[in-house]
């Protein structure tokens, strides 16, 4: 790996977390930050804990072009769009369907956005009482496999950027069934956003002691999407092929796009790929054991309906 020159900086907490909490679900404004990081940089807090490590232009155009079609599917296949991330995308209004009897459903949904997950997910109750592979792996296994080089490169750079955090995350990997880990990486899951600016949020289900990783695809003419970290009053401008390692448990959000030329996702496009370790997957049984539990539960349900 080529040696890089970094801007190193120490930042101090200036905005209390309970104050930022009030901004949850709201997009940031320019007055929320004092400066923008626009190159290789290492940012630490007053206790020398890494907040953000930016690597400019990690991937070649060839690597990005090869992986683009697989990531683009998260927009082109609307099965991967989400209508339950209203707060994440900053939506206030919810859409209420009209029932067959003509009444309005009380349960509202948000406008669907091109934001989807892939990889592995823990049991969360409701329809998902067991850990699972996401739909993307089942529907597009070849495309998923084509992304492995990207994930492994990011994992390798994580080891270089924040080795102590990488070691902690890999220790968590060892405590997790290999059925729920992206092979050869410190990650379990990815989120792919296509032209979706995130509102203020925290990723509290990620491994707090580890680090998240984000890479970005950019094309066309537009401005905005800077990643704002309000507690420390700075923002990061991610360019095409950049990689960012960051603490996902701190408050963060994207500026809204502006001055875009042409049609979204056709003439201009921004894809962010976030890789992370979902901490609750450490508690989950291997895939085969989980499947046996599903079969047992279905059998018990069937027997119950025939008593």
Indicate residue ranges for each PLM-predicted region.
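Conserved metal-binding segment of the jelly-roll/cupin
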Residues: 215, 236-251
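A short beta-strand-loop-beta hairpin characteristic of the jelly-roll/cupin
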Residues: 217-239
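Fe(II)/2-oxoglutarate oxygenase catalytic core
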Residues: 1-210, 236, 258-307
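Ordered, helix-dominated protein-protein interaction surfaces in large eukaryotic regulatory proteins
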Residues: 217, 229, 243-246, 256, ...
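Short, conserved beta-strand element in jelly-roll/cupin
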Residues: 205-222
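Intrinsically disordered, low-complexity regions enriched in proline, serine, glycine
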Residues: 224-227, 238, 247, 255-256, ...
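Residue-level detector of short, conserved catalytic/binding motifs and their immediate flanks
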Residues: 211-213, 225, 242, 271
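Conserved short secondary-structure elements within globular domains
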Residues: 189-198, 215, 222-226, 249-255
């Amino acid at each position: 790996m080529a040696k890089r020159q970094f801007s190193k900086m120490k930042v101090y907490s200036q905005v209390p977390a309970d104050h930022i909490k009030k901004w949850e679900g709201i997009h940031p404004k320019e007055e929320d930050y004092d400066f923008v990081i626009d190159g290789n940089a290492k940012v630490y807090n007053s206790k020398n804990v890494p907040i953000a490590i930016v690597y400019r232009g990690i991937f070649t155009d060839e690597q990005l072009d090869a992986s683009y079609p697989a990531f683009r599917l998260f927009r082109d296949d609307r099965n991967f769009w989400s209508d339950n991330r209203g707060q994440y995308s900053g939506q206030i209004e919810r859409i209420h369907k009209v029932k067959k009897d003509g009444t309005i459903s009380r349960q509202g949904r948000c406008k669907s956005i091109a934001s989807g997950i892939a990889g592995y997910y823990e049991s969360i109750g409701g329809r998902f009482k067991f850990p699972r592979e996401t739909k993307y792996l089942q529907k597009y296994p070849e495309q998923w496999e084509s992304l492995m080089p990207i994930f492994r490169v990011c994992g390798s750079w994580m080891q270089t950027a924040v080795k102590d955090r990488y070691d902690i995350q890999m220790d968590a990997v060892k405590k997790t069934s290999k059925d729920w880990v992206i092979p050869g990486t410190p990650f379990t899951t990815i989120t792919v956003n296509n032209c979706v600016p995130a509102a203020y949020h925290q990723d509290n289900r990620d491994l707090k002691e580890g680090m998240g990783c984000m890479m970005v695809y950019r094309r066309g003419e537009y401005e905005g999407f800077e990643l704002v970290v309000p507690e420390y009053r700075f923002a990061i401008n991610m360019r095409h092929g950049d990689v960012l390692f960051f603490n996902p448990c701190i408050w963060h959000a994207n500026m809204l796009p502006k001055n875009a030329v042409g049609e979204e996702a056709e003439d201009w496009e921004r894809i962010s790929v976030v890789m992370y370790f979902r901490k609750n997957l450490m508690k989950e049984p291997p895939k085969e054991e989980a499947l046996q539990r599903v079969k047992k539960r279905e059998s018990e349900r069937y027997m119950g309906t025939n008593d």
